[in-house]
């Protein structure tokens, strides 16, 4: 993945974040999280990744996107994490010029 700046991501998802970092990976599962990635807390039928946000930071996530404030964690808060993921994909795709 090409690098994205957290400031670009925050703007794309209509959120705020006061730290800057280059993101080269996005994770939705702390079991496969790599240091420096962006963790997005998705909710499923049997899980809520918001429960794992502190663990994501412990494992080295550069930032997290959540749908609510998490105690002792500075996150980018949005209304819908799935929409935020879509908006990031749109931002990323627009960085490239396709060959036709």
Please describe what each predicted stretch is.
Residues 89-100:
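Walker A (P-loop) phosphate-binding motif
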